[in-house]
Amino acid sequence: MNPSAPSYPMASLYVGDLHPDATEAMLYEKFSPAGPILSIRVCRDMITRRSLGYAYVNFQQPADAERALDTMNFDVIKGKPVRIMWSQRDPSLRKSGVGNIFIKNLDKSIDNKALYDTFSAFGNILSCKVVCDENGSKGYGFVHFETQEAAERAIEKMNGMLLNDRKVFVGRFKSRKEREAELGARAKEFTNVYIKNFGEDMDDERLKDLFGKFGPALSVKVMTDESGKSKGFGFVSFERHEDAQKAVDEMNGKELNGKQIYVGRAQKKVERQTELKRKFEQMKQDRITRYQGVNLYVKNLDDGIDDERLRKEFSPFGTITSAKVMMEGGRSKGFGFVCFSSPEEATKAVTEMNGRIVATKPLYVALAQRKEERQAHLTNQYMQRMASVRAVPNPVINPYQPAPPSGYFMAAIPQTQNRAAYYPPSQIAQLRPSPRWTAQGARPHPFQNMPGAIRPAAPRPPFSTMRPASSQVPRVMSTQRVANTSTQTMGPRPAAAAAAATPAVRTVPQYKYAAGVRNPQQHLNAQPQVTMQQPAVHVQGQEPLTASMLASAPPQEQKQMLGERLFPLIQAMHPTLAGKITGMLLEIDNSELLHMLESPESLRSKVDEAVAVLQAHQAKEAAQKAVNSATGVPTV
């Protein structure tokens, strides 16, 4: 060990180049002989949970960490040599460039260990890496010395030397900004000219004659294939920049043998790719800005609606620049886009058309979002809800959450103050008779706190008094851990019981329909008038659900009806997460939920997004626990 090495109070090591399947247990087994370990964390992608290829190992004593660094660097774990270095949490020290050198033109056989062994003679190395892709070494690497003096010695002694019979370049590391600045300066003084589109009959001599009038040329080359046939492009290298600039100015765009030739500054492949990428990003940003607030996403479209019909339905709200129904194999995919000329027109269309029945289905209309925006929005919503759950002393449980084998429940997300309190299915079973609701109209108290419901005149009893005195009812602990309980599947609501259980009062609707069937709960004693047969959502073992049935139900029952049909479908995809996902999806508009019940593809897409959000949250919690354990902060 090097006694002059700097002190690292955290005694934390960075372990890179890990095999994707390497786990914390494997790393513990590898590093524990060096000394007592506080914690190990393999860093993973928040969404996919796949290893990012590096980890942190925190020792109790810096001496143990240094021993591991000296004796275990480049040891093999699961067939891959790992790269170990001190964990430097201050990015300014890592990115300063002090002591960092760049080596290029390396032989393919040179790996991290060989590079380390070669340069360790010049001083203490903090990190060393040969850059690789899926095909192996890319021929260059970096060595970061502890001191600038060691780096300068390495440059002086090794630059131009042979390494595995190849002459290597060793120089000071330059940041991308520095390299781009140098590249820009060189570009202004270019002497090499690129010419293309001159046909197959051009050779070196003709090209030299064509460009020789602008000044003396160092070299002229027409690129050819194996048979000696011209590829249609070539290069001319002038002695002076002024001659090259004059050739570009005069020859670019001129006709040669009936073809318009291109003449410009010769660029390296990296330069061309960078410029193309910048142009593409600029075009993408311009397109996003142009359509911001004017492009609408329309789904739950009837199969008979085409581009013309879609344009016709939305044309009363303003000037439409484009209307497109997405097709697959000549059949509608059930969604499309309408682009207006101004944000005001688009906003008006969303307000008027969202929920309106066109043909046989209620439309879902919203401003179009990119996939990244939707996922970011969902993730943000979920994180906010979880934060509010932790703030609640006794969170209540989602009614669609089954009792998993582990005995852990996910607390329901508290909504606005007038939303219903959710209970576990076993509690709901205790609070009501075996049928869902009796013919006498008795309804359990927990649902009386939903929007639009009539609250009793008497003061509502406290939450604790509403819990039946039964040992079978689980107590909701602050840690969200409860005993394993049996769940009762909630069946469909019979029509007669629904009518008897619903008070004949005016309530605020949560769902919007066309004039013929809009707000039917304002006249609950009359039969809703539906002019055409509406498609019904069939879930095995349950009553078919149509848009008119949903509209005729009071607002507080609509989510319940949708949830009972969503839960078994989601349970078939993700049995252990069905309750959490159902609770998340019930936050979506009713029209979109109906469409998801009719379209398995749409449902699966939303379920996948919800799963991604859950995984991201779990990853964040796991990372927080790892940080807490490393710093000694107790976790709750």
From Swiss-Prot:
Domain RRM: 11-89, 99-175, 191-268, 294-370
Residue numbers of Omega-N-methylated arginine PTMs: R455, R460
Subcellular location: Cytoplasm; Cytoplasm, Stress granule; Nucleus; Cell projection, Lamellipodium
Sorted UniProt keywords: Acetylation, Cell projection, Cytoplasm, Methylation, mRNA processing, mRNA splicing, Nonsense-mediated mRNA decay, Nucleus, Phosphoprotein, Repeat, RNA-binding, Spliceosome
Modified-residue entries (Omega-N-methylarginine), positions: R385, R419, R432, R436, R475, R481, R493, R506, R518
Positions where N6-methyllysine occurs in the chain: K299
Family the entry assigns: Belongs to the polyadenylate-binding protein type-1 family.
Protein name: Polyadenylate-binding protein 1
A GO molecular function held by the record: RNA binding
Signal peptide region: none
GO cellular component: a single term: cytoplasmic stress granule
A Pfam family per the record: RRM_1
Phosphothreonine modification, residue list: T319
Family annotation (InterPro entries): Nucleotide-bd_a/b_plait_sf, PABP-dom, PABP_1234, PABP_HYD_C, PABP_RRM1, RBD_domain_sf, RRM2_I_PABPs, RRM_dom
Modified residues (N-acetylmethionine): M1
Modified residues (Asymmetric dimethylarginine): R493
Organism for this UniProt entry: Pongo abelii (Sumatran orangutan)
